[in-house]
Amino acid sequence: MSTSPSIQCRDYGQLPDGRTVHEYLLDNGAGLRLSAISYGGIVNGLWVPDRSGRVANVVLGFDALDDYVQRNPHFGVIAGRYANRIAGGRFCLDGQTYQLDRNDGPNTLHGGARGFGTQLWQAEPVPPAPGEAVALRLRYTSAAGEQGFPGCLRVHVRYSLGTDLSWRITYEAETDAPTLVNLTHHDYFNLAGQGSALGHELCIPASRYSEVGPGLIPLRHAEVAGTPFDFRTAQP
């Protein structure tokens, strides 16, 4: 049954330093609902109706804030300032070498131990654009030198639910100095809602993939043909 689109806000818990984390419940009024918390911009719930109208939460997550803070498996976070790994936790930009926080052996993963997925974001409902039912904007300012990255980076991330049962993420970032930026979302999906995901079929219209070496460091782009990574047609 259809209802009016809405966004509700409630307290979700407190961080060890006493700051309050809020949870935002987005409802497009047509059966699609999303839950996001201001800690890490984590999407901890996405309820989607299937073709028969049965609704299930299709993302993996915890029930309590402490699990996200203490265990930090990157479930549902905004990954940054640089998602994935940087070899040796170091890079050179405009002739200068920058040493980053190393939190994955000798490498930097998802921006370091205090990456964007561990930060408290400022969140607020914003007017929906045409085709959207509801929208939430999250803001975070990463100071110059945070986790070793140069430049002050102002980030806006927008979660919106469409009138067509779509969920869209929009990223914007502005820096005052040359820096590295690679933002993404880090949810894990099980479209069955629970149990095994081995019954899924996956289709990715990509002809190349990033080949990785020791430490899962990307080495080069390789052709998917003849590899287990060829999902150009749907595969289990």
Question: Language model features by range: what are they?
Answer:
Residues 2-236:
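An exposed, glycine/acidic-rich loop-and-rim segment of catalytic or binding clefts
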